[in-house]
Amino acid sequence: MDVNFEYYKIFYYVAKYHNFTKAAQALNNSQPNITRAMNWIDFAVVSTPAEVDSPLKQIMLMPFQEILVGGTTFTALGSQELSLREVKNYPLISLGRETMTYKFYNSVFLSHGLDLSPDTEAATADQILPLVKCELGLAFLPQPMAAPSLLKKEIVQIPLKDEIPERQICLVYDSQHPMGAAARELKNTIVSGRG
């Protein structure tokens, strides 16, 4: 079984179906809520950076690279190579300030002496791609998430001069909380299919 971004969606829909709405909402809104969500779930599949304090443990599953993309009105930028300073000249879409992804990009921009100041903040990662397709700005997306739209030429990849650090998909669980048989089996299946 391949580990990919669909696990997050699977967890979310299973949680919603089984009425685990508090856990699904806590994870969907903001990764810093992992600790709170662990009160209601056996494990979570999230992206780094993840704030994981004892007794929580994390297992790295799969690396991923994020790329800069824009709608088709930004096609000309696809043949250029932009610095992060130049990216700031265009409207930018990101996740909200309370998310770990925002904090990650804020630190990337700060390391280049820049402030991250997005024009549009999305509540969830799956809202970003439609906003890009609606020409609301540029955004950083995981390459696997952007790939289908890139192939269909619905969006364009914009090369960067500055390197964006690789991130990881990881599984977070409470090492002091016993899991049921089904959760343990699913966790083992996910972990055995990593990388």
Regions found by a protein language model. Give the residues of each.
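Short helix-boundary/capping micro-motifs
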Residues: V14-N28
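Hydrophobic hinge/microswitch elements
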Residues: S47, F104-V156
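Short beta-strand->loop
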Residues: K57-I67, K152-P165
